[in-house]
Amino acid sequence: MSLTGLFLCTFLVVHLVGNLQLFKHDHGTAFNTYSHFMGTNPIIRTIEWGLVLGFGFHIFEAFSLSRRNKAARSHGYVSNHSEQNSEWTSRNMGILGSIILIFLIVHLYNFFWRARFAGDLSHMGGENLETRDYDNLYLAVVSSFHIWWYVLLYVAAQISLGYHLWHGFRSGFQTLGLNHRKYTPLIKYVGYGFAVLVSAGFAAMPLYFFLFTNAQGEMAANVPALIHAVASAF
């Protein structure tokens, strides 16, 4: 489980960096170009299968571990004071993972499935694209980020992801035997930083579009100057 988890951490970094194209003020050209490349490049398409297997195996391992832990508790002491012997995140990894899984299903259907198989994004415009035959996935993202319940689900999933990474990053290295008095504190703080940066980066996207842009992704006129300056920096 540690290997698949650390592998998926690499995917999260790549996915986050790519999605930062959403903040470019080019009417979605950069993001649509990036999405088109990721969906058509044969090397990326091959790597996708490894990613699918990685997610599938990680989820399978999580359910298996949850069942084993439940069985162990049922044969153990009635009161083992688990709240004193373990962190909150480790006791609730199943709940956090379930929230992430629900979000992942909705997220994949809303974007990946529609773009790759349903073919219902081409009607969403394209006048602002340099290459007209691309699906305008940018407008699909902006449209989704103006739906309040989807924004809430997205942000809740990123909070869950942050806690999940917070615990999993350090535990992954420990499981691999990389546990040393000198390096473990460093791994711990790197894991904290990684969890916060990744989850905050993803959560900022729906919040930005929901709070500060119109239905076309253009920044509203009443946006504070500081936020406008930060977004324009991308």
Residue ranges, per PLM feature:
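Membrane-embedded alpha-helical bundles that constitute the cytochrome b-like, heme-associated redox core
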Residues: 1-234
